[in-house]
Protein backbone atom coordinates (compact mmCIF):
# COMPACT_ATOMS: atom_id res chain seq x y z
CA UNK A 1 0.00 0.00 0.00
CA UNK A 2 1.24 3.48 -0.78
CA UNK A 3 2.15 5.89 2.02
CA UNK A 4 -0.97 7.88 2.83
CA UNK A 5 -1.29 11.46 1.63
CA UNK A 6 -2.65 14.12 4.00
CA UNK A 7 -6.21 14.61 2.80
CA UNK A 8 -9.66 14.93 4.25
CA UNK A 9 -10.72 11.76 5.99
CA UNK A 10 -14.07 10.62 4.66
CA UNK A 11 -15.95 8.27 6.91
CA UNK A 12 -16.93 4.86 5.60
CA UNK A 13 -20.44 3.79 4.73
CA UNK A 14 -22.80 3.77 7.80
CA UNK A 15 -23.45 0.54 9.59
CA UNK A 16 -22.06 -1.54 6.76
CA UNK A 17 -18.31 -1.27 6.47
CA UNK A 18 -17.14 -1.71 10.01
CA UNK A 19 -18.93 1.11 11.78
CA UNK A 20 -19.87 -0.23 15.18
CA UNK A 21 -23.51 0.70 15.61
CA UNK A 22 -25.84 -2.13 16.47
CA UNK A 23 -28.79 -2.93 14.26
CA UNK A 24 -32.08 -2.59 16.14
CA UNK A 25 -32.88 -5.85 17.82
CA UNK A 26 -36.62 -5.33 18.17
CA UNK A 27 -37.89 -8.51 19.73
CA UNK A 28 -40.03 -10.28 17.18
CA UNK A 29 -41.38 -12.52 19.92
CA UNK A 30 -43.64 -9.62 20.77
CA UNK A 31 -45.59 -10.20 17.58
CA UNK A 32 -46.35 -13.79 18.48
CA UNK A 33 -47.50 -13.01 22.00
CA UNK A 34 -49.89 -10.18 21.22
CA UNK A 35 -53.21 -10.36 23.01
CA UNK A 36 -55.88 -10.80 20.40
CA UNK A 37 -58.84 -8.52 20.88
CA UNK A 38 -62.00 -10.65 20.79
CA UNK A 39 -63.56 -8.04 18.54
CA UNK A 40 -60.80 -8.59 15.99
CA UNK A 41 -60.86 -11.26 13.36
CA UNK A 42 -60.16 -14.64 14.95
CA UNK A 43 -57.52 -15.22 12.27
CA UNK A 44 -55.19 -12.64 13.83
CA UNK A 45 -53.52 -14.96 16.31
CA UNK A 46 -52.97 -17.57 13.61
CA UNK A 47 -51.45 -14.94 11.32
CA UNK A 48 -49.03 -13.80 14.01
CA UNK A 49 -47.92 -17.36 14.65
CA UNK A 50 -47.54 -18.04 10.95
CA UNK A 51 -45.51 -14.86 10.49
CA UNK A 52 -43.19 -15.89 13.30
CA UNK A 53 -42.68 -19.28 11.67
CA UNK A 54 -41.57 -17.61 8.43
CA UNK A 55 -39.19 -15.39 10.42
CA UNK A 56 -37.65 -18.45 12.05
CA UNK A 57 -37.20 -19.96 8.58
CA UNK A 58 -35.54 -16.79 7.35
CA UNK A 59 -38.26 -16.15 4.77
CA UNK A 60 -38.71 -12.46 5.55
CA UNK A 61 -40.73 -11.62 2.43
CA UNK A 62 -43.47 -14.09 3.34
CA UNK A 63 -43.30 -13.01 6.99
CA UNK A 64 -43.80 -9.37 5.96
CA UNK A 65 -46.81 -10.28 3.83
CA UNK A 66 -48.36 -12.16 6.76
CA UNK A 67 -47.67 -9.35 9.24
CA UNK A 68 -49.13 -6.79 6.83
CA UNK A 69 -52.30 -8.84 6.73
CA UNK A 70 -52.28 -8.94 10.53
CA UNK A 71 -51.79 -5.16 10.65
CA UNK A 72 -54.93 -4.69 8.57
CA UNK A 73 -56.83 -6.66 11.19
CA UNK A 74 -55.27 -4.85 14.16
CA UNK A 75 -54.44 -1.29 13.11
CA UNK A 76 -53.67 -0.16 16.67
CA UNK A 77 -50.86 -2.59 17.47
CA UNK A 78 -47.46 -0.83 17.20
CA UNK A 79 -45.53 -4.08 17.68
CA UNK A 80 -46.80 -5.45 14.40
CA UNK A 81 -45.70 -2.34 12.52
CA UNK A 82 -42.31 -2.33 14.27
CA UNK A 83 -41.86 -6.00 13.39
CA UNK A 84 -42.47 -5.24 9.72
CA UNK A 85 -40.06 -2.31 9.93
CA UNK A 86 -37.41 -4.58 11.43
CA UNK A 87 -37.82 -7.19 8.69
CA UNK A 88 -37.72 -4.57 5.94
CA UNK A 89 -34.46 -3.26 7.42
CA UNK A 90 -33.04 -6.79 7.54
CA UNK A 91 -33.62 -6.96 3.79
CA UNK A 92 -32.07 -3.55 3.18
CA UNK A 93 -35.41 -1.92 2.37
CA UNK A 94 -34.75 1.10 4.55
CA UNK A 95 -37.34 3.45 3.04
CA UNK A 96 -40.08 0.91 3.73
CA UNK A 97 -38.58 0.31 7.17
CA UNK A 98 -38.82 4.03 7.95
CA UNK A 99 -42.48 4.12 6.99
CA UNK A 100 -43.42 1.21 9.23
CA UNK A 101 -41.41 2.47 12.18
CA UNK A 102 -43.10 5.85 11.79
CA UNK A 103 -46.46 4.10 11.99
CA UNK A 104 -45.33 2.28 15.13
CA UNK A 105 -44.13 5.56 16.66
CA UNK A 106 -47.43 7.21 15.80
CA UNK A 107 -49.11 4.60 17.98
CA UNK A 108 -46.44 4.53 20.71
CA UNK A 109 -44.38 7.75 20.52
CA UNK A 110 -42.46 7.20 23.76
CA UNK A 111 -40.93 3.87 22.78
CA UNK A 112 -37.14 4.31 22.77
CA UNK A 113 -36.56 1.13 20.74
CA UNK A 114 -38.77 2.40 17.92
CA UNK A 115 -36.97 5.75 17.88
CA UNK A 116 -33.58 4.03 17.80
CA UNK A 117 -34.66 1.77 14.96
CA UNK A 118 -36.01 4.76 13.01
CA UNK A 119 -32.63 6.47 13.45
CA UNK A 120 -30.87 3.35 12.17
CA UNK A 121 -33.02 3.21 9.04
CA UNK A 122 -32.70 6.95 8.40
CA UNK A 123 -28.92 6.70 8.74
CA UNK A 124 -28.85 3.95 6.14
CA UNK A 125 -30.78 6.26 3.81
CA UNK A 126 -28.10 8.89 4.51
CA UNK A 127 -30.79 11.20 5.91
CA UNK A 128 -28.52 12.23 8.74
CA UNK A 129 -30.55 15.14 10.19
CA UNK A 130 -33.62 12.91 10.55
CA UNK A 131 -31.47 10.12 11.98
CA UNK A 132 -29.99 12.51 14.54
CA UNK A 133 -33.48 13.61 15.61
CA UNK A 134 -34.57 10.01 16.13
CA UNK A 135 -31.40 9.03 17.99
CA UNK A 136 -31.71 12.08 20.27
CA UNK A 137 -35.29 11.15 21.05
CA UNK A 138 -34.16 7.61 21.88
CA UNK A 139 -31.56 8.97 24.33
CA UNK A 140 -34.19 11.17 25.97
CA UNK A 141 -36.55 8.23 26.42
CA UNK A 142 -33.83 5.83 27.55
CA UNK A 143 -30.96 7.69 29.20
CA UNK A 144 -28.92 4.49 29.50
CA UNK A 145 -29.07 3.66 25.79
CA UNK A 146 -25.42 3.45 24.76
CA UNK A 147 -26.08 2.45 21.16
CA UNK A 148 -28.35 5.45 20.59
CA UNK A 149 -25.54 7.76 21.68
CA UNK A 150 -23.08 6.02 19.39
CA UNK A 151 -25.57 6.25 16.54
CA UNK A 152 -26.07 9.94 17.28
CA UNK A 153 -22.32 10.46 17.21
CA UNK A 154 -22.08 8.74 13.84
CA UNK A 155 -24.68 10.88 12.11
CA UNK A 156 -23.36 14.09 13.70
CA UNK A 157 -19.93 13.13 12.35
CA UNK A 158 -21.45 12.80 8.90
CA UNK A 159 -22.83 16.32 9.27
CA UNK A 160 -19.36 17.56 10.28
CA UNK A 161 -20.52 18.34 13.82
CA UNK A 162 -17.35 16.88 15.29
CA UNK A 163 -17.70 18.41 18.75
CA UNK A 164 -21.25 17.06 18.99
CA UNK A 165 -20.10 13.62 17.86
CA UNK A 166 -17.23 13.62 20.37
CA UNK A 167 -19.61 14.54 23.19
CA UNK A 168 -22.01 11.75 22.22
CA UNK A 169 -19.17 9.22 22.35
CA UNK A 170 -18.01 10.57 25.71
CA UNK A 171 -21.52 10.05 27.07
CA UNK A 172 -21.57 6.51 25.68
CA UNK A 173 -18.25 5.71 27.38
CA UNK A 174 -19.48 7.21 30.66
CA UNK A 175 -22.41 4.79 30.51
CA UNK A 176 -20.31 1.84 29.38
CA UNK A 177 -16.53 2.20 29.90
CA UNK A 178 -16.02 -1.09 28.06
CA UNK A 179 -17.74 0.05 24.86
CA UNK A 180 -15.04 -0.52 22.26
CA UNK A 181 -17.47 0.82 19.65
CA UNK A 182 -17.53 4.22 21.35
CA UNK A 183 -13.73 4.35 21.63
CA UNK A 184 -13.40 3.28 18.00
CA UNK A 185 -15.80 5.96 16.79
CA UNK A 186 -14.19 8.61 19.01
CA UNK A 187 -10.88 7.77 17.36
CA UNK A 188 -12.35 8.74 14.00
CA UNK A 189 -13.31 12.17 15.31
CA UNK A 190 -9.77 12.72 16.54
CA UNK A 191 -8.38 11.62 13.16
CA UNK A 192 -10.67 14.08 11.41
CA UNK A 193 -9.48 16.85 13.72
CA UNK A 194 -5.85 15.98 12.97
CA UNK A 195 -5.13 14.88 16.54
CA UNK A 196 -3.43 11.65 15.50
CA UNK A 197 -1.56 10.99 18.75
CA UNK A 198 -4.78 11.10 20.79
CA UNK A 199 -6.54 9.04 18.12
CA UNK A 200 -3.89 6.33 18.44
CA UNK A 201 -4.31 6.29 22.24
CA UNK A 202 -8.10 6.01 22.02
CA UNK A 203 -7.99 3.37 19.29
CA UNK A 204 -5.46 1.34 21.24
CA UNK A 205 -8.00 1.30 24.08
CA UNK A 206 -10.58 0.03 21.61
CA UNK A 207 -8.14 -2.65 20.43
CA UNK A 208 -7.49 -3.77 24.01
CA UNK A 209 -11.23 -4.11 24.58
CA UNK A 210 -11.83 -5.84 21.23
CA UNK A 211 -8.59 -7.48 20.02
CA UNK A 212 -10.42 -9.51 17.37
CA UNK A 213 -12.14 -6.56 15.69
CA UNK A 214 -10.63 -5.94 12.28
CA UNK A 215 -12.43 -2.60 11.95
CA UNK A 216 -10.56 -1.24 15.00
CA UNK A 217 -7.24 -2.27 13.49
CA UNK A 218 -8.16 -0.47 10.27
CA UNK A 219 -8.85 2.76 12.10
CA UNK A 220 -5.75 2.37 14.25
CA UNK A 221 -3.71 1.85 11.10
CA UNK A 222 -5.14 5.03 9.62
CA UNK A 223 -4.23 7.08 12.72
CA UNK A 224 -0.71 5.66 12.80
CA UNK A 225 -0.12 6.26 9.10
CA UNK A 226 -1.41 9.80 9.19
CA UNK A 227 0.70 10.47 12.26
CA UNK A 228 3.77 9.46 10.29
CA UNK A 229 4.24 5.99 11.77
CA UNK A 230 4.20 4.06 8.52
CA UNK A 231 5.52 0.68 9.67
CA UNK A 232 3.12 0.31 12.61
CA UNK A 233 0.24 1.62 10.50
CA UNK A 234 0.77 -0.96 7.79
CA UNK A 235 1.14 -3.64 10.47
CA UNK A 236 -2.30 -2.72 11.82
CA UNK A 237 -3.77 -3.03 8.33
CA UNK A 238 -2.13 -6.42 7.91
CA UNK A 239 -3.58 -7.49 11.26
CA UNK A 240 -7.05 -6.47 10.10
CA UNK A 241 -6.73 -8.55 6.95
CA UNK A 242 -5.39 -11.47 9.01
CA UNK A 243 -8.32 -11.30 11.43
CA UNK A 244 -10.90 -11.43 8.65
CA UNK A 245 -9.25 -12.55 5.41
CA UNK A 246 -12.51 -13.50 3.71
CA UNK A 247 -14.60 -10.64 5.00
CA UNK A 248 -15.52 -8.39 2.08
CA UNK A 249 -16.56 -5.67 4.52
CA UNK A 250 -12.95 -5.41 5.72
CA UNK A 251 -11.72 -5.01 2.15
CA UNK A 252 -14.50 -2.49 1.56
CA UNK A 253 -13.37 -0.38 4.49
CA UNK A 254 -9.73 -0.67 3.47
CA UNK A 255 -10.80 0.60 0.06
CA UNK A 256 -12.69 3.52 1.59
CA UNK A 257 -9.79 4.44 3.84
CA UNK A 258 -7.33 4.32 0.94
CA UNK A 259 -9.70 6.28 -1.27
CA UNK A 260 -10.05 8.93 1.42
CA UNK A 261 -6.27 9.21 1.43
CA UNK A 262 -6.25 9.57 -2.38
CA UNK A 263 -4.51 6.21 -2.89
CA UNK A 264 -6.89 5.40 -5.73
CA UNK A 265 -4.98 2.42 -7.10
CA UNK A 266 -4.75 0.77 -3.69
CA UNK A 267 -8.43 1.47 -3.07
CA UNK A 268 -9.38 -0.05 -6.41
CA UNK A 269 -7.54 -3.27 -5.57
CA UNK A 270 -9.32 -3.49 -2.21
CA UNK A 271 -12.75 -2.91 -3.77
CA UNK A 272 -12.06 -5.58 -6.39
CA UNK A 273 -11.07 -8.03 -3.66
CA UNK A 274 -14.32 -7.30 -1.85
CA UNK A 275 -16.36 -7.93 -5.00
CA UNK A 276 -14.48 -11.16 -5.66
CA UNK A 277 -15.87 -12.47 -2.37
CA UNK A 278 -19.29 -10.80 -2.60
CA UNK A 279 -20.14 -9.82 -6.19
CA UNK A 280 -23.20 -7.78 -5.22
CA UNK A 281 -21.53 -5.62 -2.55
CA UNK A 282 -23.01 -2.25 -3.43
CA UNK A 283 -20.52 -0.10 -1.56
CA UNK A 284 -17.56 -1.64 -3.38
CA UNK A 285 -19.13 -1.04 -6.78
CA UNK A 286 -19.95 2.54 -5.77
CA UNK A 287 -16.36 3.07 -4.66
CA UNK A 288 -15.05 1.81 -8.00
CA UNK A 289 -17.41 4.17 -9.80
CA UNK A 290 -16.18 7.13 -7.76
CA UNK A 291 -12.58 6.25 -8.60
CA UNK A 292 -13.46 5.97 -12.28
CA UNK A 293 -15.00 9.43 -12.07
CA UNK A 294 -11.87 10.77 -10.40
CA UNK A 295 -9.70 9.22 -13.13
CA UNK A 296 -12.04 10.62 -15.81
CA UNK A 297 -12.97 7.14 -17.02
CA UNK A 298 -16.50 8.35 -17.64
CA UNK A 299 -17.68 5.42 -19.74
CA UNK A 300 -16.51 3.01 -17.07
CA UNK A 301 -18.17 5.12 -14.37
CA UNK A 302 -21.49 5.13 -16.25
CA UNK A 303 -21.40 1.34 -16.53
CA UNK A 304 -20.46 0.93 -12.87
CA UNK A 305 -23.12 3.28 -11.52
CA UNK A 306 -25.76 1.55 -13.62
CA UNK A 307 -24.72 -1.63 -11.85
CA UNK A 308 -24.95 0.12 -8.48
CA UNK A 309 -28.48 1.27 -9.30
CA UNK A 310 -29.46 -2.25 -10.35
CA UNK A 311 -28.35 -3.45 -6.92
CA UNK A 312 -29.89 -0.57 -4.96
CA UNK A 313 -32.49 1.60 -6.69
CA UNK A 314 -32.79 3.83 -3.62
CA UNK A 315 -29.13 4.93 -3.73
CA UNK A 316 -29.59 8.57 -4.65
CA UNK A 317 -25.85 9.28 -4.77
CA UNK A 318 -25.44 6.70 -7.54
CA UNK A 319 -27.94 8.54 -9.76
CA UNK A 320 -26.14 11.79 -9.02
CA UNK A 321 -22.70 10.40 -9.81
CA UNK A 322 -23.98 8.77 -12.98
CA UNK A 323 -25.35 12.17 -13.97
CA UNK A 324 -21.88 13.66 -13.48
CA UNK A 325 -20.33 10.99 -15.70
CA UNK A 326 -22.99 11.46 -18.38
CA UNK A 327 -22.57 15.23 -18.29
CA UNK A 328 -18.80 14.87 -18.71
CA UNK A 329 -19.48 12.60 -21.71
CA UNK A 330 -21.68 15.30 -23.34
CA UNK A 331 -24.77 13.10 -22.98
CA UNK A 332 -26.92 15.97 -21.79
CA UNK A 333 -30.40 14.46 -21.99
CA UNK A 334 -29.30 11.31 -20.15
CA UNK A 335 -27.51 13.41 -17.55
CA UNK A 336 -30.66 15.44 -16.94
CA UNK A 337 -32.62 12.23 -16.49
CA UNK A 338 -30.06 10.89 -13.99
CA UNK A 339 -29.94 14.14 -11.99
CA UNK A 340 -33.75 14.25 -11.95
CA UNK A 341 -33.87 10.70 -10.62
CA UNK A 342 -31.30 11.69 -7.99
CA UNK A 343 -33.43 14.70 -7.03
CA UNK A 344 -36.60 12.61 -6.76
CA UNK A 345 -34.83 9.99 -4.64
CA UNK A 346 -33.21 12.56 -2.35
CA UNK A 347 -36.61 14.23 -1.85
CA UNK A 348 -38.32 10.92 -1.19
CA UNK A 349 -35.74 10.22 1.49
CA UNK A 350 -36.04 13.70 2.99
CA UNK A 351 -32.40 14.50 2.19
CA UNK A 352 -32.47 18.27 1.67
CA UNK A 353 -28.72 18.67 1.16
CA UNK A 354 -28.73 16.04 -1.55
CA UNK A 355 -31.79 17.55 -3.18
CA UNK A 356 -30.14 20.97 -3.33
CA UNK A 357 -27.05 19.43 -4.92
CA UNK A 358 -29.14 17.69 -7.59
CA UNK A 359 -31.17 20.86 -8.25
CA UNK A 360 -27.95 22.81 -8.81
CA UNK A 361 -26.73 20.19 -11.29
CA UNK A 362 -30.03 20.36 -13.19
CA UNK A 363 -29.92 24.16 -13.36
CA UNK A 364 -26.51 23.99 -15.01
CA UNK A 365 -27.89 21.78 -17.77
CA UNK A 366 -31.18 23.57 -18.44
Where are the language model's segments positioned?
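N-terminal leader/linker segments that initiate helical-solenoid repeat arrays
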Residues: 2-83, 89-92, 99, 363-366
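Helix-start (N-cap) detector for alpha-helical repeat units in TPR-like alpha-solenoids
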Residues: 44, 78-79, 112-113, 146-147, ...
